[in-house]
Curated annotation (Swiss-Prot):
The keyword Oxidoreductase does not apply. This is Meiotically up-regulated gene 8 protein. Has a role in meiosis and septation. One of its GO terms (cellular component) is cell division site. GO terms for biological process: division septum assembly; meiotic cell cycle. It comes from Schizosaccharomyces pombe (strain 972 / ATCC 24843) (Fission yeast).
Length: 720
């Protein structure tokens, strides 16, 4: 009895670093990038009234894909010590939109160790300049010695030059009616210039005052150093800055910014820490508070300034945004209602799925609102655990609201979100600053029956979605070869959707099913025996491949590489030893990475970026060797197999009448999926991974999201 062996090997790749989520950067590596970004931003003509809003608030976080792709591409190109030429960086930056340009610059500002200036550098400069009696060229002389490296000095110069340019644009803005634009820019830039430790509110206001005075002094010192007169004796500075400089002496006197009163409303909840500013406002407006304090706090959204409320909506989108849901386009119709559909405020469903994906089972028990463009209707359960604590008055400045908004930007790494961690700032119609602060919960409380029931419903909905996707319709016992439409029914849904989320979520669901508290909610996804006559063998192998692959997942953003040994290599394969560990699986399941499957002429090769493959016609018996198949208990315990092997018996196919519907390998070839059907994976997205160079060049500047290629390409074709 002769046997042929077809080996399907799943090779997990080496995990590359996600450059966007790194905590800090090396100055020598980003010097040229920072210089070109700052220079480009200076040249942009921005409306002076929107400068502060664009710098601190930004755009919707689901449009950050351009900045994320740019940062990842830059660091990936600069690895192994390669220095990207300045002209190449400049050409790449010119293609960025204004929002992406600001996002990339803000990303760098928040990842420079110790801030752009750092306190050690400022103290050395202050001491040297004071002893020298403040010479005009003091910045160029003393700052070079205060900074440790020339790259730090160059970045600091570009930073101050950018602040000077923004001050000139803000000089005619209505936002700077109470203070000069130089002071206003220094107040906002304080969060970029220095490192901010964890402090309480009053200490934060004092620290902000200190940072602002240091920024203002360095900015005036730089302007004083660069203020060179022309041949006719006139200053080269903008006229708006010249008029402001007349009101400043050097060195400037220390100013107390905290000269206004603000109300701090403090409340507590026993088990829930809110992260959304709109949700916090809704909690306060619905909370029972003493009658004599109702006039002090806003009781509805009408009591908040329109501009402030609009900005809070943007901050709310950023606060509730998880990187896990960045795809936001799923091919699974009604997978989870609003689960991946442009999340604006966190929902209980999103938090449950997010907790599964991250392995944290504590975040999914809290009720969350789901009203996108207005103040959310918070679950009534949440108010039963809210309690009013105090209403106090602090001395601060209204402009610190811009610093608070900047502290909520998506570009700040999670480990550095130490500024205003538990509060929301808003401005009412009278122009008063109101601070809503929540105390840290002390201990969790037991879940109510309704919360458990809600969680079980979500788990059941997730599982039903898995069953609908992974178990296509069964076939009859009559002889029938797998058609293209049936193959697509069990492949295209996963390949066109967020397949990585599905794989990882399946793994997390199996892990949760082992827990006592989740056994009634989640049933383990078990392996299917391929000899079951009610299952298509191809579908069974496809299902088992997904379940086995989900058990081997190490990262959400890495794709496994599938290596296929073709039929012309079968004779050269070594025989399988009885002691080797292997798993029976259908080789046709290897095609599930294709978005479309269309029969074409035969081919015997797999090219680098395409997903085409060919198989010689082989016949398979109705009894498939399942001696090496995985047991359910082994999979639940996390057993991992390296190779998938399948023994095919040709001798049992002497008679064609014996052919059963369990034929796994047929003579098919699949052409690469068309551009219209491709959806990029969830991992680090790059246009070159999915599109051809010509296609990438034609649509790179026009699409609004890498996950809406189908709409973008159709629009381009309609225009042509």
């Amino acid at each position: 009895m002769s046997r042929s062996i077809c080996t399907l090997t799943c090779i997990l790749p080496t995990f590359s670093m996600d450059y966007w989520n790194q905590e800090c950067v090396e100055l020598s590596q980003v010097e040229n990038l920072f210089t070109e970004l700052a220079s480009r931003l200076e040249l942009l003509e921005m409306n002076s009234k929107n400068v502060l809003y664009r710098l601190t608030i930004g755009t919707n976080p689901d449009r950050n894909w351009e900045a994320i792709a740019f940062i990842r591409e830059f660091f990936d190109s600069a690895k192994h010590g390669y220095v990207i030429p300045k002209h190449e960086i400049r050409n790449r930056i010119r293609l960025l939109s204004e929002a992406s340009l600001i996002s990339c610059l803000r990303w760098l500002l928040h990842r420079i160790p110790g801030g752009v200036i750092t306190w050690s550098t400022y103290k050395l400069f202050d001491e040297a300049e004071t002893r020298a009696n403040y010479p005009v060229r003091g910045f160029d002389i003393f700052m070079k010695h205060a900074t440790k490296h020339s790259c730090h000095f160059n970045i600091l110069k570009c930073f101050l030059k950018l602040l000077m340019s923004l001050s000139a644009k803000l000089a005619v803005s209505s936002n700077s009616s109470t203070v000069s634009s130089l002071e206003l820019v220094s107040q906002i830039a304080s969060i970029w210039a220095f490192d901010w430790p964890m402090m309480n509110l009053q200490e934060t206001f004092i620290y902000w005052d200190r940072c602002t005075n240091a920024c203002l002094r360095l900015l005036l010192c730089y302007i004083r150093y660069t203020n060179k007169s022309s041949e006719t004796g006139f200053s080269c500075l903008p006229s708006a800055l010249q008029s402001q400089l007349q009101s400043f002496n050097y060195p400037p006197s220390l100013k107390k910014l905290n000269d206004a009163k603000a109300h701090v409303f403090t409340f507590s909840m026993n088990y829930y820490m809110t992260r959304d500013p709109l949700e916090m406002i809704q909690i306060v407006t619905k909370m029972n508070i003493p009658d004599h304090l109702t006039a002090t706090l806003p009781r509805s959204s009408d009591d908040i300034q329109n501009d402030c409320l609009f900005a809070l909506r943007q901050v709310s989108k950023r606060s509730s945004y998880h990187s896990v849901f960045s795809a936001q386009e799923s091919a699974w119709t009604d997978f989870i209602k609003n689960g991946f559909d442009h999340p604006i405020l966190p929902t209980c469903t999103q938090e449950t799925v997010y907790s599964l994906l991250t392995g944290n089972d504590t975040a999914c028990v809290y009720p969350f609102p789901n009203k996108p463009y207005r103040l959310p209707d918070v679950d009534f359960e949440i108010f039963s655990h809210c309690s009013f604590e105090s209403l106090t008055t602090v001395t601060t400045n209204t402009n610190i609201w811009w610093v608070w908004a900047e502290s909520r930007c998506t570009e700040i790494p999670e480990s550095k979100r130490t500024v205003f961690p538990n509060c929301t700032m808003l401005i009412d119609k009278t122009g008063r600053l109101i601070i809503l602060q929540q105390t840290v919960p002390q201990k969790p409380v037991a879940l109510t029956a309704s919360s458990n029931k809600r969680k079980n419903r979500i788990f059941g909905k997730i599982r039903r979605s898995f069953k609908r996707i992974l178990k296509p319709r069964k076939i009859n016992k009559t002889v029938k070869i797998m058609s293209n439409s049936q193959r697509r029914s069990c492949q295209s849904v996963l390949s066109e959707g967020n397949r990585t989320i599905l794989l990882h979520l399946a793994d997390q669901m199996n892990a949760c099913s082992l827990q006592t508290k989740s056994r009634e909610s989640i049933k383990t996804l078990k392996l299917i025996e391929e000899k079951d006559e009610y299952w298509e063998p191809e579908t069974a192998g496809y299902f088992n491949t997904i379940v086995g692959w989900a058990d081997q997942r190490k990262s959400l953003y890495d794709e496994a590489v599938i290596k296929i040994n073709h039929s012309n290599m079968l004779n050269t394969l070594p025989p399988t030893s009885q002691g080797a560990t292997s798993t029976t699986v259908s080789s046709a399941s290897s095609n599930f990475l294709s978005s479309s499957c269309t029969p074409i002429d035969d081919t015997n090769s797999v090219t680098g970026s395409t997903l085409s493959c060919s198989f010689d016609e082989m016949k398979l018996s109705d009894k498939i060797d399942d001696a090496n198949s995985l047991k359910d208990d082994d999979f639940i315990q996390g057993s991992k197999k390296d190779f998938f092997e399948m023994n095919l018996n040709h001798s049992s196919y002497q008679n064609k009448d014996e052919l059963k519907p369990f034929q796994l390998l047929v003579k098919h070839a699949f052409k690469p999926p068309s551009y219209r059907l491709i959806r990029p994976p969830l991992r680090d997205w790059q246009s070159s991974d999915t599109l051809s160079s010509e296609m990438s060049k034609s649509i790179s500047s026009s699409r609004s999201s890498p996950f809406s290629l189908e709409q973008t390409i159709s629009k381009i074709q309609n225009k042509l």
